[in-house]
């Protein structure tokens, strides 16, 4: 007989369980040795009767001190080799006891690495994991919430009632619970009770799958159950630096590339129709494509265009389509809008089979305030700074990560490793880096806090970015890490051991703004703005630059690329072709946004798909043909990519002909006599005999002309090429006398034989 003091303690603990205020349920629940006998205590809210099955015998569990706390006496130590039989409302079922699993899931070494911020595979411990332990199948849950008073697992398994399954608090603010009755596909959340008594229902920060919006629960999902076939791709990728290869990127948004009619159902592997995910109210009767459908339609399209990589705007789970994916709540989960994690793995796998790399937009700079997300996670500012002057982007309505906290950095750095390791991606583009680097970013005076040295640099964010890139290249030496950094912060693409941020590419925002400003000017006035088209070369070799015409430039009233151009339709098409061709010949890797490859007219709208009907018209097919041929030429001519980051690879012939708005230059390959001559005419004037100097006499084949009829141009040019003439110009003794078509860029290559 248990003594009175013991009975009072048990009653007190049971009341705490009922009120969801118990952080140590193992202290009372599960197997215990009391007064020379083994006792099983189980907590079963609203149960009518409970029995314990052990070694082919059944032992009745009596309700003790509380109507939902049951106790059975067994003849020996049962360990976890018993089951509980529960009768509730006339329904009886048998299950293993959640509190029979008493061992720590996250061991001392794991906790130590996590607390240091150096557990690069923390997702293998945190979150929901399908495991088999001691012949028990179930799900192990593990979460970090050091300030919580209590946490429970809620879901379909317990009617979303937090009184059923309280978690056990471990050292380091870690909470754990093994749920033997749960399985793959079960929905769940964490019910977190704060020290102040408030209750939050949170999705799993480490969840591998979440519900389709507008629902926001997490879903138990297997992690390592996909058979990859891209080992040769990965081996080749990591054997050498990728930035010394041609890189031509198709940036796109999976949800607005192409829609499908809701009448056309998607059938899964079992032939069953999948519930459609509506595209948007703006276009009723349409649905989003699934990952398998995108695999069949998008990958062949990108391959046909000749791009080397696809860049996907954020696919981490996010609740609001209108955020374009940049307000993430499910960092470890591909969005379920398009399907399952394994279906996305198959998408990546197929990309690699077709020779296409996959880049993901990654958003470590901020996160939304959605109640089910990271904000105020355990009743305190856990992931974000407590002071809004450093912890909030008021203009964006989002919160900023507390990069000074080891566990927060670990969450993000491990997330980076996760996408490369678990989904075999090839690169990331880090969004809004400038917003991370500066404490006063988009903040008026008085609404930001200087750093310890009195400056505006965010020292903690700098260290985080350096750590993230260092760890990334340590694990994946062939990765691409691209910074969207819009200021003149130094050494963005220099290694971390040199004091740099450690990226290997940076979007050239200056080039983008200068070129768009220049091309929006009426061609007759471009002579007064020649510097806009030439200035980028003066700083081109300070960083490893990527030229990007991105999604940001075709929204919010900015017009799509074609409609930025002045003049009538003929001039718009010609200007677009000239800009794209100049971009492909300018030093730097390439990125364009979807729709630019065929001259989309309308601004990008996340709620709609692209204007594919425009391809019925020749000028739009011409722009698409131009991109196809530019990508083919680009990959076949090393002079266009091999020395992107070496001044040897570029040389002006003439950049001073302002009155004609003509520029000419050479692109050179290293250690060879291979070079290309590029001449751009940025006015509608046709020049019949325009002379430029060249270093070697002979025949120069015209290998590309943006004014060609295949591209919708007037087909003016140089009849396949030109022989040099003996004429001293531009410090050369040989010259080419060329026909320059209107609003065009022409490319010539010296031939050893005509």
Curated annotation (Swiss-Prot):
One of its GO terms (molecular function) is hydrolase activity, hydrolyzing O-glycosyl compounds. The active site is at 431 (nucleophile), 484 (proton donor). SMART domains: Aamy (SM00642). Keywords: Carbohydrate metabolism, Glycogen biosynthesis, Glycogen metabolism, Glycosyltransferase, Transferase. Its EC number is 2.4.1.18. Monomer. This is 1,4-alpha-glucan branching enzyme GlgB. It comes from Prochlorococcus marinus (strain MIT 9301).
